[in-house]
Amino acid sequence: MSKGTPSMGKMNKMTHIACRRCGRISFHAQKKVCSSCGFGRSTKMQSFKWDTKRPKTPTH
């Protein structure tokens, strides 16, 4: 495998397509799993604690 211009010719396939649940272009066409909401893997919406901004708390 070489890097650079020859490798760019291989980048013509759609890896991710639109997700039926969240609508984002995050549904992996081969794996059949959405990387954004977890559709295809889980019935619950994927969410993380670090994803939401928490209110500032006093430090002293």
Curated annotation (Swiss-Prot):
Any Pfam family: Ribosomal_L37e
Source organism: Methanoregula boonei (strain DSM 21154 / JCM 14090 / 6A8)
Transmembrane segments annotated in the record for this chain: none
Keyword RNA-binding attributed: yes
ZnF bounds (C4-type): 19-37
Record-level Gene Ontology MF annotations: rRNA binding; structural constituent of ribosome; zinc ion binding
Segment forming the signal sequence: none
Family designation: Belongs to the eukaryotic ribosomal protein eL37 family.
Protein name: Large ribosomal subunit protein eL37
GO annotation terms (biological process): translation
Cross-referenced HAMAP family: Ribosomal_eL37 (MF_00547)
UniProt cofactor note: Binds 1 zinc ion per subunit.
Cellular component terms per the entry's GO annotation: cytosolic large ribosomal subunit
Binding residues annotated for Zn(2+), in chain numbering: 19, 22, 34, 37
Coiled coil: none
